[in-house]
Amino acid sequence: MKIILATSNKHKVLELKEILKDFEIYAFDEVLMPFEIEENGKTFKENALIKARAVFNALDEKQKKDFIALSDDSGICVDVLEGNPGIYSARFSGKGDDKSNRDKLVNEMIKKGFKQSKAYYVAAIAMVGLMGEFSTHGTMHGKVIDTEKGENGFGYDSLFIPKGFDKTLAQLSVDEKNNISHRFKALELAKIILKILNKG
């Protein structure tokens, strides 16, 4: 069984390939011509399913027998911002780049009079294939701070300190991050489903 990732985000592709290294993984653009997918769901799960369905439906009939489309939709929910940016995390600033998104998050938090806040990451993984549709979830709790720290990671990692740590995700090694991340937790559950489907 082969897995096609329904993302063109290079950071996500690397992270997903690392965590799912027991499987034969292909990035979206290794199999299909890239195309835009409108994420108009109201939850992380809905958006993950929209992406996985779109990619699976773009495969030809032979490919559909060989591939499962796997998608991740994830984001950060900040308490003092009433759960925002949430499903809009990737495009929070309107510009769609990580630095602008981080700057906006910090500015919104400071406007409300806070230098830090409880926050949590959410990841929803969706899998779509001939055998049906499946989804898993993972969360990681901690806090966001108003100063970026660390060079690793992407997204909001340089602002997020996981519970039980005194470093941001961007200060942790790839292995340290992958062992505690929301995406890792969701993918560990997804692996169980994928192994069952592979036997089926």
Curated annotation (Swiss-Prot):
Keywords: Hydrolase, Magnesium, Metal-binding, Nucleotide metabolism, Nucleotide-binding. It is an enzyme of class 3 (hydrolase). Substrate binds at residues 7-12, 74, 154-157, 177, 182-183. This is dITP/XTP pyrophosphatase. GO terms for cellular component: cytosol. The keyword Glycoprotein does not apply. Mg(2+) binds at residues 38, 73. GO terms for biological process: nucleotide metabolic process; purine nucleoside triphosphate catabolic process. Coiled coil: none annotated. Binds 1 Mg(2+) ion per subunit. The keyword DNA damage does not apply.
